[in-house]
Amino acid sequence: MAVPFDRPGSGLMPPPDNLVVPEDDGTVSADVAVIGSGMGGSTIAHALRDSGLDVLVVERGEFLPREIENWSPEAVFEHARYKNSEQWYSADGPAFAPGVYYYVGGNTKFYGAMMPRFRERDFGDIEHREGVSPAWPISYGDLEPFYCEAEALYGVHGTPGQEPTEPPRSKDYPYPAVPHEPPIQRLADDLARQGLRPIAMPLAIARHRGGGCVQCRTCDGFPCMVDAKGDADVSALRPLVRSGRVRLLTGTTVTRLETAADGSTVTHAVGRRSGQSVTIRAARFVVAAGAVNSAALFLRSASDAHPNGLANGSDQVGRNYMVHNSTFFVAIDPRRANETSFQKTLGLNDWYFGAPDWPWPLGNVQMLGKLQAPMVSAARPWAPKALLRYMTGHSVDLYLTSEDLPVRTNRVVVGPDDRIVVHWTPNNLSAHRQLVRHTTKAIRRAGFPLVFTDRMGIETNSHMCGTLRMGTDPATSVLDPTCRAHELRNVWVTDSSSFVSSAAVNPALTIAANALRVAAVSDLVGTN
């Protein structure tokens, strides 16, 4: 059921009514065409808002409807009401439903609003038990001022200086940390008594004065019905489109990028909208369709000038796919109910770069939004619902993330039938197993004797990155350090496909900061 935007005092921003419609011949023209409206696409559009350029954002989806079902665990998880992606395929054949959403704002409409910075060391070579995480062609210092700008844009709450892995910052968080509710504060105190240093997670939610966040149980994994999540749509793109500073074309899937005869520039994009062909002409193109879809677009754009795929003379397009090693971790104290509403406030980085018995990096521990029975029954339909209600009513729910390493054979390809095929073999699992072991020990000491874990598979790809990585050597990278394609004069990439490594924290803030950096340091604005 739809919910009106004109409720008195709601402060809600309805979708704009000034969306682009192609000309009768199916053409749309702009100075800059941004393909994708997720974190990378909407943030680069925001960065270009006062450039004097005609900026067009092209999104394959529409605005996600605001309706009561936004906050229904049954609708969102059991009935998959908002899942609208095509199937992808694993290398050995089986299809899977990827964790992607095609709406204005992309996956940020459903993300948990966790917005951490990468650690300073994450941008250099880091030795792991199973290999080396390679250095980026930029440093943390290059990105730091743009981290500050991104935190301001998305309204991040946090507390600096809580643990030693935290990188230096030139500005404080825009807003103070979201406090723990009593059950999570007890857990934080129990962990601190073990010598650990639990932190307040950096969160992009509108919990400040005048903000609309009600700290509900339906944030992480749900769309926000009150526009209080710092997503790419509400925080960055929608205000610009409503004001006319950026234009938006929805419902349009870009299928190819076409180049001039010499292959040095892209002249136009080809797409489909409501079954009709669309041609998008621009002087500059920014690709931000997500790590898998951006790589697939480059591969689908093969031509005489680029026979192996656009900008793929190095055979690097689609390679080095990373997605994190992640485990869903549920700890239960059957003696004590967890009545927390907004659970996602606590994190641990004590083992990020290692432990006393493990000299290599382990990763990050963070709370999830509060687990509810319908969210579990979607994955475990055979389980009695009464049991699931009891378990989720007595659990704390965490997400454990370890870095996976970039390897050539983990890659995205497009099959002869135009299917997206993901070749993915997990690596660096020894570190992840150690992270699960250390977390289990600490959580049990904190009073939760029952622990259930489930390592995420190929379909859990919300942290995907690395398929069009940046670098200084065109033989081993697709993009230069300003994220322009080595082989093209007028194409940039601002999603996570540019990442050289995955680190071990959520990528959203780094995507946004890098998009702001690209707008500031590249010749995107000045290219003729």
Annotate each PLM feature.
Residues A200-A204, G212-C219, L249, T255-E258, ...:
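A glycine-rich dinucleotide-binding beta-alpha-beta segment and adjacent secondary-structure elements
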Residues D50, G61-R66, N70-W71, S243, ...:
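Glycine-rich loop(s) and the adjacent beta-strand/alpha-helix scaffold that form part
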Residues Y103, A260-A261, R272, D480-P481:
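Short, acidic, Ser/Thr-enriched surface-loop or helix-capping motifs
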Residues G211, C224-D231, R273, N308, ...:
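Alpha-helix capping and helix-loop boundary segments enriched in small/acidic/polar residues
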Residues D92-G99, R117, W136-Y140, F146, ...:
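FAD cofactor-binding and catalytic pocket of flavoenzymes
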Residues A2-C148, G271, V287, N293, ...:
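N-terminal glycine-rich phosphate/pyrophosphate-binding loop and immediately adjacent elements
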Residues G26, G40, F96, A289-G290, ...:
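Secondary-structure capping and boundary motifs in well-ordered enzyme cores
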Residues A2-R7, E127-V254, G457:
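Conserved redox-cofactor binding core of oxidoreductases
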